[in-house]
């Protein structure tokens, strides 16, 4: 279910403030955030945001195709190791 258009996009205020500061200072360091729920705005294009996945911060470089998506979509929280292989006995 998508968010209502009359509400507009949700972005944490501290993330917007950090992004504006990075743009004005032309800072290339990643911006650390735990806000996976924040939507990517056009002002974030070209920035690297380190999104927390529950264990570590995953660096995400923001491109124009990511605008409108949420930050959490690009930092996976679960690791899939694959299904266990069949352990069949090989007789010689």
From Swiss-Prot:
Entry function: Protein S19 forms a complex with S13 that binds strongly to the 16S ribosomal RNA.
One annotated GO biological process: translation
Chain's gene name: rpsS
Protein family per UniProt: Belongs to the universal ribosomal protein uS19 family.
SUPFAM superfamilies: Ribosomal protein S19 (SSF54570)
Entry GO terms, CC: cytoplasm; small ribosomal subunit
Name of protein: Small ribosomal subunit protein uS19
InterPro entries named among the record's database cross-references: Ribosomal_uS19 (IPR002222), Ribosomal_uS19_bac-type (IPR005732), Ribosomal_uS19_CS (IPR020934), Ribosomal_uS19_SF (IPR023575)
Database matches in NCBIfam families: rpsS_bact
Keyword vocabulary terms for this entry: Ribonucleoprotein, Ribosomal protein, RNA-binding, rRNA-binding
Organism: Polaromonas naphthalenivorans (strain CJ2)
Entry GO MF terms: rRNA binding; structural constituent of ribosome
